[in-house]
A protein has these predicted regions:
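Bacterial N-terminal signal peptides that target proteins for export
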Residues: 2-12
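N-terminal signal peptide c-region/cleavage motif recognized by signal peptidases
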Residues: 17-22, 27
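Domain-level signature for proteins that mediate thiol-based redox and metal-cofactor handling
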Residues: 23, 38, 66-67
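Short hydrophobic/aromatic patches at helix-to-coil boundaries
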Residues: 30, 104-108
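Axial heme c-ligation environment in periplasmic c-type cytochrome domains
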Residues: 39, 48-59, 72-101
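Short microdomains enriched in Cys/His and/or Lys/Arg
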Residues: 58-68
Length: 108
């Protein structure tokens, strides 16, 4: 089998090399899954806790929302979304909490 020179092999090679690269949104979803956020939350529907898109809508005009939510991720909270409290997640680092908070706020 011979390869003709008119085939787009460089483009194909590039596409194949990018196939294994995760998008930032997928990476942040993986982080949320690994930190057990998805046990109580979903992106687009209420589970035990509110949907991430609802959280994003609620805090869309809050300039300090990323830090506020990062603190809630680590320390927990109650009373904002009803009677069920969010437990503390002390195993989540501050950097990961901020990354998760920024991702949650980016959901639509």
């Amino acid at each position: 089998m011979s390869l003709s020179t008119n085939r787009p092999l460089p483009a194909l090679a590039l596409l194949l090399s990018l196939a294994g690269v995760a998008t930032p949104a997928a990476a942040d979803l993986a982080l949320a899954t690994s930190k057990n956020c998805m046990s109580c939350h979903a992106v687009d529907r209420k589970v035990l806790g509110p949907a991430f898109k609802d959280i994003a809508a609620k805090y869309k005009d809050n300039k300090g929302a990323t830090d506020l939510l990062a603190t809630k991720i680590i320390k927990g909270g109650a009373g904002v979304w009803g009677p069920v409290p969010m437990p503390a997640n002390t195993q989540v680092s501050e950097a990961d909490a901020k990354k998760l908070a920024a991702w949650v706020l980016s959901t639509k």
